[in-house]
């Protein structure tokens, strides 16, 4: 299944806020309708929608998400927590959380078009897994800096997660540590996602 490229508001109306996909928020009316419908949903539907929230927020294909679930399942610790850490430490998501891109699709475009350095080297793979002490900077040219500056200026004034440090005037971000689960940028029950895939096999 390919990455979703359709109407974004349609997805947030059904699944709730997906800040990685779009800065738009569902209306109060649609949230109330979703709450009233939730009492009628089957357990399968609930697990499916949690999985879809994760996939659309992080901009993944079905195959990519399944791959992350399998990697998380082989790691030590809670599969759900490890899954969220893997997704949050992707380069495209780090750029988004720093405010250097307005959405994850925009961050992916910055990376694909080679506007971003990691530790002084161009990285053009959005799924690159960032690690503690990685330094992320804009390419040293006017176009790259302008694109990132526009995002920084339009980013909502939210508290930066503790695993990241931003130096906006230098177009630079630092990864301090692996993300703590309480700072994950999406309201999600990750255990339902793991359950969804465990029942597919």
Curated annotation (Swiss-Prot):
This protein's GO CC annotations: chloroplast; small ribosomal subunit
Location(s), subcellular: Plastid, Chloroplast
Region annotation (Disordered) ranges: 20-44
Source domain of life: Eukaryota
S4 RNA-binding domain location: 89-150
Pfam families recorded: Ribosomal_S4 (PF00163), S4 (PF01479)
Keyword field contains Ribosomal protein: yes
HAMAP family membership: Ribosomal_uS4_B
Entry similarity comment: Belongs to the universal ribosomal protein uS4 family.
Function per UniProt: One of the primary rRNA binding proteins, it binds directly to 16S rRNA where it nucleates assembly of the body of the 30S subunit.
UniProt subunit comment: Part of the 30S ribosomal subunit. Contacts protein S5. The interaction surface between S4 and S5 is involved in control of translational fidelity.
Protein name in UniProt: Small ribosomal subunit protein uS4c
Organism of origin: Lotus japonicus
Gene: rps4
């Amino acid at each position: 299944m390919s990455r979703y490229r359709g109407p974004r508001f349609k997805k947030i109306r059904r699944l709730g806020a997906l800040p990685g996909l779009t800065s738009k928020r569902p209306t109060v009316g649609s949230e109330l309708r979703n709450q009233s419908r939730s009492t009628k949903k089957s357990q399968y539907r609930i697990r499916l929608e949690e999985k879809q929230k994760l996939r659309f927020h992080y901009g993944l294909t079905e195959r990519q998400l399944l791959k992350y679930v399998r990697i998380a399942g082989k790691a030590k610790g809670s599969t759900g927590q490890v899954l969220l850490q893997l997704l949050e430490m992707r380069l495209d998501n780090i750029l988004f959380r720093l405010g250097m891109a307005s959405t994850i699709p925009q961050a992916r475009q910055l990376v694909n078009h080679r506007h971003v350095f990691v530790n002084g080297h161009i990285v053009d793979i959005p799924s690159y897994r960032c690690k503690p002490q990685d330094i992320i900077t804009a390419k040293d040219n006017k176009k790259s800096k302008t694109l990132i500056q526009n995002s920084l200026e339009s980013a909502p004034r939210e508290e930066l997660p503790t695993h990241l440090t931003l130096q906006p005037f230098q177009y630079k971000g630092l990864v301090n540590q692996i993300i703590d689960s309480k700072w994950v940028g999406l309201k999600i029950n990750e255990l339902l996602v793991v359950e969804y895939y465990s029942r597919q096999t």
